Amino acid sequence: MQLKRVAEAKLPTPWGDFLMVGFEELATGQDHVALVFGDISGTEPVLARVHSECLTGDALFSLRCDCGFQLEAALSHIAEAGRGVLLYHRQEGRNIGLLNKIRAYALQDQGYDTVEANHQLGFAADERDFTLCADMFKLLGVDEVRLLTNNPRKVEILTEAGINIVERVPLIVGRNPKNEHYLDTKAAKMGHLLSGN
C-alpha cells in the first residue's frame, strides 16, 4: 500500500450526505480524499469516479476545461445510483502543479494547445499516476467498479493495478465555446472518448 486511511467525517452536499474519507501517501504525506455515498460493501460493482484535482474548474468555475462540470455530474450520478465512490486525486493540472498549470494556460492564450503547452514546459501531456487510486479503492473494500470516465488510460492503469473495471460509463458534460479546442485536443491527442458532446 502506498497510502493509509487517516480520518473520516460526514459531508453534506446538494446531492446528499457523503462520507468523506481522508488518505495520506506514505512516501510524501500528500493527502487525497474519497467521497463515499451509501453502502458500498457487497459484491455488486460500485459506480465510481477518479477525479483529478482542478482548482480552476472545481472551485473557481473556469470554462477552460470540463472538470467542474464532471465533478458535479459524477456526484449527482453516484447519489442517483444510491451508492458509489468519488476519489478526489490531488494531482493538479494533470500533475504539473497549479503554478505550472497557470503557465500552461498562458501558453494556450498564445495559441498552443493543452498538450503542446505541457511539452513547452518540459512535461508529458499527462503526468498523472493513477496506481495510487487502486490502493484507495482497496482500502475502501471496493474491487469491482463501473468507472465514470472518458479516459481509457484510467481504465487500463486501474485494471493493471488490480481493480476490476466492469464498465466504462461516459461522463460527457460541460462543452462550451471556451473549452471546445481543449476537449478536441484531449480527444485527438490523448485518446479521450468524447463523442456526443
From Swiss-Prot:
Positions bound to GTP: R49, V50, H51, S52, E53, Q70, E92, G93, R94, T114, T149, K154
PANTHER family: 3,4-DIHYDROXY-2-BUTANONE 4-PHOSPHATE SYNTHASE (PTHR21327:SF18), GTP CYCLOHYDROLASE II-RELATED (PTHR21327)
Cofactor note: Binds 1 zinc ion per subunit.
Gene: ribA
Species name: Cronobacter sakazakii (strain ATCC BAA-894)
InterPro entries: GTP_cyclohydro_II (IPR032677), RibA (IPR000926), RibA-like_sf (IPR036144)
Keyword rRNA-binding (UniProt): no
An example Gene Ontology biological process: riboflavin biosynthetic process
Active-site feature positions: D126 (proton acceptor), R128 (nucleophile)
Record family assignment: Belongs to the GTP cyclohydrolase II family.
GO cellular component: cytosol
Pathway where this protein functions: Cofactor biosynthesis; riboflavin biosynthesis; 5-amino-6-(D-ribitylamino)uracil from GTP: step 1/4
Positions with a binding annotation for Zn(2+): C54, C65, C67
The keyword Zinc is annotated on this UniProt entry: yes
EC number assigned by the record: 3.5.4.25
Swiss-Prot/TrEMBL catalytic activity: GTP + 4 H2O = 2,5-diamino-6-hydroxy-4-(5-phosphoribosylamino)-pyrimidine + formate + 2 phosphate + 3 H(+)
Cofactor: Zn(2+)
Pfam families linked: GTP_cyclohydro2 (PF00925)
Subunit structure: Homodimer.
Name of the protein in its database record: GTP cyclohydrolase-2
Function, in words: Catalyzes the conversion of GTP to 2,5-diamino-6-ribosylamino-4(3H)-pyrimidinone 5'-phosphate (DARP), formate and pyrophosphate.
GO MF: GTP binding; GTP cyclohydrolase II activity; zinc ion binding
